[in-house]
Amino acid sequence: MKKSLIQKLGLLGVVSFLSYTAAVVFAPLAYPGYNWMAQAVSDLSAANAPSLALWNQLSALYNACEVVCVTIVCIGIQGQKTRLLRTGIYLFAVMEWISAVGYRMFPLSDSGYAGAFQDVMHMVVTALVVLLSIVSLTVIIIAGIKSRDCCSYGICAAIALAMMLVGAMGMKIVPSEYFGVVERFSVFAATGFNAALGIHQFCMKSKEIKE
């Protein structure tokens, strides 16, 4: 069956995920001494990071495709599934937009945390992103429990939330030399779930899509 344009655009979530993965994997090559097991991913895109140029090149499709994908999903899901699921997806979309705009406006001024104004704002953006991520994913999980039609969304949301919690708790528990390992669970959770939403959009039956 021929896919509509709005279905095909859902695959931009996968493109976003691959772009982000490429940046996380290859940007350290331009950062002498970077220890991925101990350092955060955000160190790679800090304002004075030697890897910033390569990071921007590799992640060029990440933010653009991510926000387009989640916006397309919001359009495609209108009037479909349950109101609870739609609410969760809308909240997740707000989080994605805050993340895309906020981290571009306020990158870390130095690798780590230097205490400058933009570092403080970076932390504020992070707090909003984390809060909205937890709330939106929880709502989607509940929607999946309540409706069999939303079950696959709920499963994906549960996996993403579990990854976030593993990352958050792990960063407090594991030795500092393994901080980067557990932190990556958190950073890949959101972009991974975005890709899952895009795949759901692509696979949605054409009769369910509003052109």
Residue spans for each PLM region:
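Interfacial segments of alpha-helical transmembrane regions
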Residues: 6-14, 81-94, 150-157
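Alpha-helical transmembrane segments of multi-pass membrane proteins
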Residues: 17-36
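Aromatic-anchored segments of alpha-helical transmembrane domains
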Residues: 21, 95-102, 161-171
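Interfacial helix-start motif at the membrane-water boundary
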Residues: 44-64
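Internal transmembrane alpha-helix with an interfacial aromatic "cap," most often the third helix
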Residues: 61-88, 135-146, 198
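Membrane-proximal helix-loop-helix units in multi-pass membrane proteins
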Residues: 99-140
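Terminal transmembrane helical module of multi-pass membrane proteins
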Residues: 141-211
